[in-house]
Amino acid sequence: MKPIAIDDFCTVRSLANVTFSPEGTSACFTVSQAKKEKNCYKSRLYLLKGGRVRALTGGGKESSFCYLDENTVLFAGDREGEKEPSLTSRFYKIALDGGEADLAYTFPIPVSQVFPLKNGDLLVVGSTFPGFEDLYKGDKKLVKAYFDDKKENEDYEVISQLPWWWNGGTYTRGAYESLFYYDAKKKSLTRLTDAGFNVSDVQLAEDQKTVYFSLLDVSVPRPAHFGGQDLYRIDLASRRQKLVVKSRPDFVIATYALGKSFLLVMAADGKFGMNTDCDFYKLDYETLAVTPYAVYGEAIGSSVGCDVRHGGGQAFKMDGDVLYFISTRFDGAGLYKLEDGTVSPVLVRDGSVDCFDRKNGKMLLCALWDMKPQELYDETGRRVTHFNDAMLRGKYVAQPDPLNLTAGDHEVHGFILKPMDFEAGKKYPVIFDIHGGPKTVYGPVFYHEMQYWASRGYFVIFCNPTGSDGRGAFMDIRGKYGTVDFDDLMAFCDEALAKYPEMDADNLFETGGSYGGFMTNWIIGHTDRFRACASQRSISNWTSFYGVSDIGPDFSEDQCGSTIWPDVEKFWWHSPMKYADKVKTPTLFLHSLEDYRCPVDQGYQMYSALIAHGVESRLVLFRGENHELSRSGKPKHRIRRLNEITGWFEQHKG
């Protein structure tokens, strides 16, 4: 068997956005792959029809699409090139029976979504900017004025609201998405939603008479990004906008789905903070009355961690009045349905269903099953694509051994990967990997970095402590960071060492990112059991995180279970920086300079504290990367990251 190499994630092809044609005779989806030489990702559209799979495009930048009709697909792209600065968006159409893609639509603003209408027109979701709200009209003088203003002010940032930047982006500057109607004959856009409001979650009714969407007022100093968004609809004949239902603290709307006879709202009561899971509610189309439909309280969508997933897709869809949806339960994500107020499983296996579509009783699921990267499966669970067979052929893929234990009044679920060429009685070093979130889960899925370490001769252990997803409010961690979660992690580590005598307790290493980075920082201040640790994109100080993260004020107060004024001592108690003078463990810190979720100052603080106290430490910073470095960062940067962590552990082996 050959080992998994450090750059093998570049040979993985990731599938996403699987979508049936209007009549269900074909399906399209995207396939993405990292390209190490060009240090980028390429994405193409693929077609599944009659049991055959073939590439539909070859440009390498096709990631969003929709069906124009049964035999034509519309996708975003830019094959023309621009000689001057431009905001222009272009969409191309291609026939499923072959031929070249043709330019179909050109818009004067950045466009993220289009919804084809039966009359040949479109609904369009596009970006607009404060002070230049009429850019959608295509006035060249206004476009020039926009770029002149941008250049004139490029040395300044004027901040007037929270959050003032977003992870991986830049300062918010109040940009927002609006809904437009596109007249195909006149080739013109008409604004449907007012300036100063951000549109999201747009859904077109099946009869195409009404469009629904969430709306958020972004003109105020502190938009309610985490307070749920209000649901509106527009009658396309009259262009009249109507409020359908408002979010409130005890009814935080996450999303919704359009059924045949009612609208299904997924909303949380907020009893467990911003991570409260949703229940289901029925909304009458005529009266707009909202009534409880089903108590659920579990996660909707997949939160199973993975580093070979690129792209998204549907997590739920209504078929008549039956909701099909992905839900994370315990250590995996499966497909379920809600019918007549009752939830039941449809297709649940070890691993994760990442997205799906359903049409005329047929289904296609993009899933991480059988310890393989993503493939497509049908409604019976039969695999219908084989994109990643070749990359796994002849390679050692460690199979996860479940390890569950009782810790106090709850169970902790986890997994063990054995090293390549494992021999009973022989000692092996151990890497303990802690997930982010904390409201995510580790599951039995192909995780490149873990497989790489197993191929390098390490045991890899990982688990889902208190605070993880998949178990409803039972795992609530608010106000308890560094207490029960720390106890769970240490208990799991103890159990793993006891069950596998081949694990070398003198060569025990630990790493984690985001919440896992917080726990790494906490661990090194509370135990010396690890030979070396690697803290990635971490939180070290809740009092400063409050003011620098894009989610700082909301997330820090929610997760600390209090308000920073007057309870600053509680925030400090839960901060790893408070205990930095106790650290003895050699620690590597990795941060991305455009990570505004867990900003680099958090790493600076811990690194400075360790050096000041004479503890061996190293800080590695990545330019041009953000919070997603380990999952979608530039391929060469991902390799460097993994080399840094692995090299740090190798350097400190006993």
Locations of the language-model features?
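Multi-bladed beta-propeller domains
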Residues: 1-14, 47-63, 85-87, 94-110, ...
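Non-catalytic accessory segments flanking enzyme active sites
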Residues: 16-19, 156-160, 165-166, 170-178, ...
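Blade-terminus and WD-like Trp-Asp/Gly-His loop motifs, strongest in beta-propeller folds
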Residues: 19-26, 64-72, 114-120, 202-210, ...
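Beta-strand C-termini and the immediately following turn/loop, strongest in propeller blades
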Residues: 28-37, 68, 74-83, 124-129, ...
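Predominantly five- to eight-bladed beta-propeller fold
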Residues: 43, 128-180, 225-230, 278-281, ...
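Cap/lid segment of the alpha/beta-hydrolase catalytic domain
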Residues: 387-506, 513, 547
